[in-house]
């Protein structure tokens, strides 16, 4: 990575404004999944060890520029203190006199959590005045919130106009892993693209067709490709306005020598429920009042074989409606193939794919699970991320 990280700067005694991603799911004031807090620990611990005064900023939920009591970061600060095994202070605002006083009282190695930055309307507008207020608290800006790196907000990008700006360790790892995948991949390189809609994945498919050896398609978006081949798809998801694009992608793959894999059989159902009756049919045999909800067993075998013979696999989007047991086998099979593959580096692109490997208990078998769904998708589209562009070059 050609951006400076916290390893490249002197931190001792410095006030560090560190943007983290503590946007964790909460239920009745309790954190239900602390993955994102744990992901930030190496950076926070490094800053503490280096003798920095660690000022942490994050958003939580979508308060839309006003104070929402249940979206305060108080429970997050409390849990962080437990995980760090030290006292973590919490400010009830993200800038201004109270925050400044608390920062002024900090010693080297102290940790302070600021209030939810999205309580302020200027955050999502990338307001320069708010960015200046944040910057006034610190000597150095550290961005470790890869999950929010595709947003040009005051605390993720704007603040970098007023302070030296470097990446944290999590951000650095994300950029190294995803950057290597796109610029210098080990081959064969396979991308697995799933999820519901073609329109969400157009950019990533187009960009990856120039990079990969194999492209595997699954999930709801596959049926637009199936229809593009001239097959009937019953009640399956289809974006009729994307059929021509699907044809174009299949043609491009052929021209570029990319092996393009689509389902050969699918799991179909007449009803969307945990107890649904399902059938398995060939891709050209979906009855008019049934819909495809998962890839079939033959497809699973083919995909698993491609995965097994790949050196690098990037996976973005499930193969079916994995949240429901009858339609989860395809996604599970892809996860299992990645877990079992020897010598294959697996990159899980955040979002639903990450949720799926967690759900199936396979997370620890994956080489890298990205902490940013939208951010990793935009990165794989070849877009520049505002929260990265703003960092100082090495």
Swiss-Prot record:
MF terms (GO), sorted A to Z: ADP binding; ATP binding; phosphoglycerate kinase activity
Residues modified as Phosphoserine: 183
Keywords, in A-Z order: ATP-binding, Cytoplasm, Glycolysis, Kinase, Nucleotide-binding, Phosphoprotein, Transferase
Coiled coil: none
Catalytic activity: (2R)-3-phosphoglycerate + ATP = (2R)-3-phospho-glyceroyl phosphate + ADP
Enzyme Commission identifier(s): 2.7.2.3
Enzyme type, top EC level: transferase
Pfam families: PGK (PF00162)
Top-level lineage group: Bacteria
GO biological process terms held by the UniProt record: gluconeogenesis; glycolytic process
InterPro entries assigned to the protein according to its UniProt record, in alphabetical order: Phosphoglycerate_kinase, Phosphoglycerate_kinase_CS, Phosphoglycerate_kinase_N, Phosphoglycerate_kinase_sf
CDD domains: Phosphoglycerate_kinase
An example Gene Ontology CC term for this record: cytosol
Record keyword Membrane present: no
Protein's UniProt keywords contain Cell membrane: no
Pathway where this protein functions: Carbohydrate degradation; glycolysis; pyruvate from D-glyceraldehyde 3-phosphate: step 2/5
Residues that, per the record, bind substrate: 21-23, 36, 59-62, 118, 151
Main location: cytoplasm
Modified residue annotations for Phosphothreonine: 299
Compartment annotation: Cytoplasm
Residues involved in ATP binding: 201, 292, 323, 350-353
Protein family per UniProt: Belongs to the phosphoglycerate kinase family.
Known partners and oligomeric status: Monomer.
PANTHER family: PHOSPHOGLYCERATE KINASE, PHOSPHOGLYCERATE KINASE 1, CHLOROPLASTIC-RELATED
Protein name: Phosphoglycerate kinase
UniProt source species: Bacillus cereus (strain Q1)
Encoding gene, per UniProt annotation: pgk
């Amino acid at each position: 990575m050609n951006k400076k990280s916290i390893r490249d700067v002197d931190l001792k005694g410095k006030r560090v404004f560190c943007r983290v991603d503590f946007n964790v799911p909460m239920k009745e004031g309790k954190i239900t999944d602390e993955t994102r807090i744990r992901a930030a620990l190496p950076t926070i611990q490094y800053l503490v060890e280096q003798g920095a005064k660690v000022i942490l900023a994050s958003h939580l939920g979508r308060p839309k520029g006003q104070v929402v009591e249940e979206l305060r970061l108080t429970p997050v600060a409390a849990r962080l203190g437990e995980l760090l095994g030290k006292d973590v202070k919490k400010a009830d605002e993200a800038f201004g006199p109270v925050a400044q006083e608390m920062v002024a009282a900090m010693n080297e190695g102290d940790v302070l959590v600021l209030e939810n930055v999205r309580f302020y309307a200027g955050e999502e507008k990338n307001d320069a005045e708010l960015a200046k207020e944040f910057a006034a608290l610190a000597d150095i800006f550290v961005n470790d919130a890869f999950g929010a790196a595709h947003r040009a907000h005051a605390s993720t990008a704007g603040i970098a106009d007023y302070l030296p700006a470097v990446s944290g360790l999590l951000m650095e790892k994300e950029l190294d892993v995803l950057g290597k995948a796109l610029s210098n991949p080990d081959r064969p390189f396979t991308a697995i693209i799933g999820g519901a809609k073609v329109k969400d994945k157009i950019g990533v498919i187009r960009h990856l067709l120039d990079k990969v050896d194999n492209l595997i398609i699954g999930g709801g978006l596959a049926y637009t490709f199936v229809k593009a081949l001239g097959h009937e798809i019953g009640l399956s998801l289809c974006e009729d306005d994307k059929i021509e694009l699907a044809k174009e992608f299949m043609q491009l793959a052929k021209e570029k020598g990319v092996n393009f894999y689509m389902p050969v059989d699918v799991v179909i159902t007449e009803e969307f429920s945990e107890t649904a009756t399902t059938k398995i049919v060939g891709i050209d045999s979906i009855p008019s009042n049934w819909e495809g909800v998962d890839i079939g067993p033959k497809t699973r075998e083919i995909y698993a074989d491609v995965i097994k013979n790949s050196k690098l696999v990037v996976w973005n989007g499930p193969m079916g409606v994995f949240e429901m047991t009858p339609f989860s086998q395809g996604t599970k099979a892809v996860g299992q193939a990645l877990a079992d593959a020897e010598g294959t580096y697996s990159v899980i692109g955040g979002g639903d794919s990450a949720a799926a490997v967690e759900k199936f208990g396979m997370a620890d078998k994956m080489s890298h699970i990205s902490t940013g769904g939208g951010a990793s998708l935009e990165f794989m589209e070849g877009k520049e991320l505002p929260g990265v562009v703003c960092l100082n070059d090495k």
